[in-house]
Amino acid sequence: MKKKVISAILCGAMVLGTVCPVLAADDKSEDTKTEAAGNSAEGKKIALVGKAAGNAFFEIAAKSFQETVEAEGGEVQVVYPETATADAQIKVLDNLISQDFDAICISANDVNALQAKLEEAMDEGIKVSSFDSAPNKDSREIFVNQAGTKEVAQALMDAVLDISGGEGQFAILSATSQSANQNAWIDAMKTIMEGDDKYSKLELVDVVYGDDEPQKSTDQTAALLQNYKDLKVICAPTTVGIAAAAKYLQDNGSECKLTGLGLPSEMQEYTGDDADHSCPYFYLWDMQGLGKLSAYTTISL
């Protein structure tokens, strides 16, 4: 096995060498699109709402989003809820609606719970987009998807199959139980697993939630090892979770291995195909590209 990192360039996400379109686009030149975006962004205020503070994954995209909008003459306010919950995001949205923003771009903590507040924003004339984790289609005008749900799930299932040697117990360490993107990936993983005999010797023993908090993710990793003595692989489709699990497994010399979605900068010391490293390989797309594409999409609404 070798380390594999997934990369996306603006309008596509690459999964195991396959380019998957994530947003329809016309054939205009980059210069034309930039000029159009610049005209529409001039003097506009845009709010970017994250799932929670302290997530380096989102911060990379947020920085790219902000730089792109500001380069086109707009202003960005990046806002984080107090906790990674829908209720906390609703409080943030309630405050933003009263501040005369032209647009809101959000990574949602729940598929349906934000609908009333986001519909209120749109009724007030605020443009609403989303990226990374989508609210339902009635809650926004467009969603910029970093990669296809099935493609992400397929890559993760194949990694579990590979790292486990094709059989044995594995578990999933996710973000929050309401997280739209993680839940979609996990559901797709289960569907893929049930529909193909090559996964028949794998057993998904548990799905646990670290709420994208390092300590809780560490505690959940420890609990998995305690509860499942024969656990061979943990799959963490969350950058916070995978980093916490990688450190715990490696520090404790666990034979259980890890894969999932992680940031190279956070996973470098834990990644290697040998007994000394907890994670043989992991995946991720280009968060800077995702932030830039989301910015241009939002200011074009």
Q: Which residues make up each language-model segment?
A:
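A residue-level marker of the well-folded mature domains of exported/periplasmic proteins
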Residues: K2-V5, I9, M14, L23-L301
